[in-house]
Regions:
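Electrostatic cytochrome c docking/interface patches
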Residues: 28-65, 122-125
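Bacterial N-terminal signal peptides
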Residues: 9-18
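Sequence/structural segment immediately N-terminal to covalent heme-attachment motifs in c-type
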Residues: 42, 54-81, 87-88
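Sec-exported extracytoplasmic/periplasmic mature domains
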Residues: 46, 67, 71, 75, ...
Length: 177
């Protein structure tokens, strides 16, 4: 064995031994999450609506929430600027031009919109909206896209019944089942 290979093997062994020693001596940082903390983040909503919380909201109520919490990033009536558009784009997915992906043209399930808004919006205060505010702002966005009427109320029962324009625009597959 050459000196170079011997040094390389020795250096590798030393690096591994150091890593093991460091891991054994590292400080105990953090703590285990409590059941309450875990429950607070267990908020996933599936396409079928399982897990939707109590609450409700209308497009009119959502307009006020949108004006206070969303317009700075998504523009007047969801038109975009500086961030993503939320409205329009219907009919742009198939075609020669780049698609305009919005809630009204791309998202397949209204429950997924709820889930995303609830956990990630507003961008600088994620998870800060009440359930009623989330239902309301989702109702407003759906209304702007012509998916629900002005007088509709979104809640755990009605939201899962909304048929999004692109619901059938995705290919489903099974993972070996």
């Amino acid at each position: 064995m050459s000196t170079r290979n011997a040094l390389l093997i020795a250096a590798s062994g030393l690096a591994m031994a150091s890593a093991v020693a460091f891991a054994a001596e590292s400080p105990n940082l953090g703590r285990a999450a409590t059941p309450e903390e875990i429950a607070a983040w267990d908020i996933s909503i599936g396409p079928d609506g399982v897990g939707l919380p109590p609450g409700s909201g209308t497009p009119k109520q959502g307009e006020a929430v949108y004006a206070a919490k969303c317009v700075a990033c998504h523009g007047d009536k969801g038109a975009g600027a500086p961030n993503d558009r939320l409205v329009g784009g219907q009919g742009t997915l198939p075609g020669d031009k780049p698609p305009v992906k919005t809630v009204g043209s791309f998202w397949p399930y209204a429950t997924t919109v709820f889930d995303y808004v609830r956990r990630a919006m507003p961008y600088d205060e994620s998870k800060s909206l009440t359930n009623d505010e989330v239902y309301a702002v989702v109702a407003y966005i759906l209304n702007l896209n012509g998916i629900i009427a002005d007088g509709d109320t979104m809640d755990a029962q009605t939201l899962q019944k909304v048929k999004m324009p692109n619901r059938d625009g995705f290919v489903t597959f099974s993972r070996g089942k």
